[in-house]
């Protein structure tokens, strides 16, 4: 009998992957976690049935959520990552010798434990001496932070369930306060393609625009996320991701990536017309 993983993208659209075996499943205090093995995408895990990470395409997401802001401001030293229990975002950040401190906040310790056990590809740098892991709600963690971080990356789940609070106006206001005077906020921005995802994306984007003077949106193709068309939000107090971008300086670092490059850095901010119309002037 064949085993398939299926995610409901809309009432009329489903995405399926043929599964070779089930590796682990459990219900934590916060959510259900499943680890599966597939011939096409390798090992992957889901939270409450929603795709989080696959071994085959994780590099796309993690390259884009990290290297775009890091290349925009080469002087980033203190970073806060909210979510990111799989460790992929941390892995990419630790490639920069200039980064001095990385605080990672994950609400569900079991996500980290499971990824340490089953996903060494992404979790391999969680024990880096610069990394501090806090198991608590990111919304609460950031409330008492002020003028502390150069970069905040919100590598959260979707805007419901445990990650719901990370899409609120209060949260984005606290992120602004926690950033230094030239700080950058980057968050996964959902997909613009299906109506429900697009509505969540637009709502989150509108909230961020209330606080930051520089607002942009960029994109990547991630095959296992809904529609494959995925957006990231870039919000900054000072640095513009294209006008202040020094491609030559980043290339001199010699960081080898599988997806990100300096040509793509500029190109990923060129949005399709339907996305630009959806944002309706909500970028600088």
Curated annotation (Swiss-Prot):
Amino acids binding spermidine: 62, 86, 155-158
Residues bound to S-methyl-5'-thioadenosine: 31, 106, 137-138, 162
Gene Ontology biological-process annotations: spermidine biosynthetic process
UniProt GO cellular component terms: cytosol
Catalysed transformations (reactions): S-adenosyl 3-(methylsulfanyl)propylamine + putrescine = S-methyl-5'-thioadenosine + spermidine + H(+)
Keywords: Cytoplasm, Polyamine biosynthesis, Spermidine biosynthesis, Transferase
First-level EC class: transferase
Entry annotation: catalytic residues: 155 (proton acceptor)
A matching Pfam family: Spermine_synt_N
Location(s) in or outside the cell: Cytoplasm
Family to which this protein belongs: Belongs to the spermidine/spermine synthase family.
Subunit structure: Homodimer or homotetramer.
Name the record gives this protein: Polyamine aminopropyltransferase
């Amino acid at each position: 009998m064949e085993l398939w993983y299926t995610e409901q993208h809309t009432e009329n659209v489903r995405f399926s992957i043929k599964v070779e075996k089930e590796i682990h499943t459990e219900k934590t205090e916060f959510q259900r976690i499943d680890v599966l093995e597939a011939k096409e995408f390798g090992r992957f895990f889901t939270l409450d049935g929603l795709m989080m990470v696959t071994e085959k395409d994780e590099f796309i997401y993690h390259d884009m959520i990290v290297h775009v802001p890091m290349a925009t401001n080469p002087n980033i030293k203190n970073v806060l990552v909210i979510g990111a229990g799989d460790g992929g975002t941390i892995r990419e950040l630790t490639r920069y010798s200039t980064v001095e401190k990385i605080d990672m906040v994950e609400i569900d310790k079991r996500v980290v434990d499971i990824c340490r056990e089953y996903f060494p590809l992404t979790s391999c740098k969680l024990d880096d001496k610069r990394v501090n892991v806090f198991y608590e709600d990111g919304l609460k963690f950031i409330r008492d932070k002020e003028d502390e971080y150069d970069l905040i990356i919100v590598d959260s789940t979707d805007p419901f369930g445990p990650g719901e609070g990370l899409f609120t106006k209060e949260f984005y206001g606290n992120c602004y306060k926690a950033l230094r005077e030239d700080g950058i906020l980057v968050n996964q921005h959902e997909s613009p393609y299906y109506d429900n995802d697009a509505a969540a994306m637009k709502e989150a984007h509108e909230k961020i625009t209330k606080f930051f003077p520089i607002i942009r949106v960029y994109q990547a193709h991630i095959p296992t996320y809904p529609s494959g068309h995925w957006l990231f939000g870039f919000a900054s107090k000072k640095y513009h991701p294209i006008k202040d971008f020094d491609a030559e300086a980043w290339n001199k670092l010699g960081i080898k990536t599988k997806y990100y490059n300096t040509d793509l850095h500029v190109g990923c901010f060129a949005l399709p017309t339907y996305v630009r119309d959806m944002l309706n002037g909500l970028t600088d």
